């Protein structure tokens, strides 16, 4: 296992395991410690657990999504599979579009190409007032805002109370996110719309959804492009954090799909 962070290398990336390179990217308000429960099952891969800029142990990086992706690309191996949860899925999707030769497979978990609801297009997503509420609360009470967001992620799951506790315990093992990075992330969730660019993704693409997800409604999946290289898995009882609430079902979707990248 090794981890790196320095003045020249502001991203904290923890590398564990041996095998094909797999990059794993967390969502808003948390850090890569949320994936700790998956370490053992992913040990046949060389997994790079990334703290996004300003989250966990990574230093903030000013700029937009492209700036973040450039920093990731410069510090991660080429020819890797990229997996992203929630906001991390948006990051991984944009990276697969912008750097197709670097990314040989894409996995999005409870993620949308456009998180914001667009009423005029009947596009399902997060109501605008919810994100603006989080933005306002950030300035008042950072820890409470993070905790409230974790609660929303588990909402709908039968084990919501336990899920929230597990997420909170994992996330709080590292420093709270940088306030500016949280605002950057909210802006990305608010503004980015990749729907018209999805047809350029030619890599094998696994999309894992939670039917009870309160942030990425189940109605998003039928509106997504389909093709022979795309696999959709809808977990019937999962909410926004399926790898926490339904780890075995999540791994049953993920691990067989990953075997195509083994030599």
From Swiss-Prot:
Subcellular location: Cytoplasm
The protein's annotated pathway: Cofactor biosynthesis; biotin biosynthesis
UniProtKB keywords: Biotin biosynthesis, Cytoplasm, Hydrolase, Serine esterase
GO molecular function: pimelyl-[acyl-carrier protein] methyl ester esterase activity
Residues involved in substrate binding: 28, 86-87, 149-153, 240
Enzyme class: hydrolase
GO biological process: biotin biosynthetic process
Documented EC number(s): 3.1.1.85
Cellular-component GO terms for this entry: cytoplasm; membrane
TM region positions: none
Active site annotation, chain numbering: 86, 213, 240
Family from the record: Belongs to the AB hydrolase superfamily. Carboxylesterase BioH family.
Function as written in the Swiss-Prot or TrEMBL entry: The physiological role of BioH is to remove the methyl group introduced by BioC when the pimeloyl moiety is complete. It allows to synthesize pimeloyl-ACP via the fatty acid synthetic pathway through the hydrolysis of the ester bonds of pimeloyl-ACP esters.
Quaternary structure and partners: Monomer.
Name the UniProt record assigns to this protein: Pimeloyl-[acyl-carrier protein] methyl ester esterase
Organism: Shewanella oneidensis (strain ATCC 700550 / JCM 31522 / CIP 106686 / LMG 19005 / NCIMB 14063 / MR-1)
């Amino acid at each position: 296992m090794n981890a790196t962070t320095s003045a020249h290398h502001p991203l904290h990336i923890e590398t564990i395991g041996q095998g094909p390179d797999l990059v794993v990217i967390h969502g808003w308000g948390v850090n890569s410690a949320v994936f700790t429960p998956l370490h053992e099952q992913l040990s046949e891969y060389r997994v790079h657990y990334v703290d996004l800029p300003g989250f966990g142990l990574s230093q903030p990086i000013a700029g937009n999504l492209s700036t973040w992706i450039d920093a990731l690309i410069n510090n991660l191996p080429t020819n890797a599979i990229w997996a992203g949860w929630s906001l991390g899925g948006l990051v991984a999707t944009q990276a697969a579009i912008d750097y197709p030769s670097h990314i040989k497979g894409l996995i999005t978990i409870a993620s949308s190409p456009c998180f914001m609801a667009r009423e005029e297009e009947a596009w399902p997503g997060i109501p605008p007032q919810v994100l603006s509420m989080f933005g306002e609360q950030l300035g008042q009470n950072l820890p409470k805002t993070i905790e409230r967001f974790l609660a929303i992620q588990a909402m709908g799951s039968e084990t919501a109370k336990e899920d929230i506790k597990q997420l909170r315990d994992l996330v709080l093992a590292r420093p709270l996110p940088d306030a500016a990075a949280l605002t950057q992330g909210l802006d990305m969730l608010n503004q980015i719309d990749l729907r018209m660019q999805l047809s350029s993704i030619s890599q094998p693409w696994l999309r894992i959804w939670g039917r009870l997800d309160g942030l990425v409604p189940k109605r998003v999946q039928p509106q997504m492009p389909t093709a022979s290289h795309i696999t959709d898995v809808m977990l019937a009882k999962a909410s926004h954090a399926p790898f926490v609430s339904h780890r075995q079902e999540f791994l049953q979707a993920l691990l067989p799909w990953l075997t195509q990248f083994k030599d």
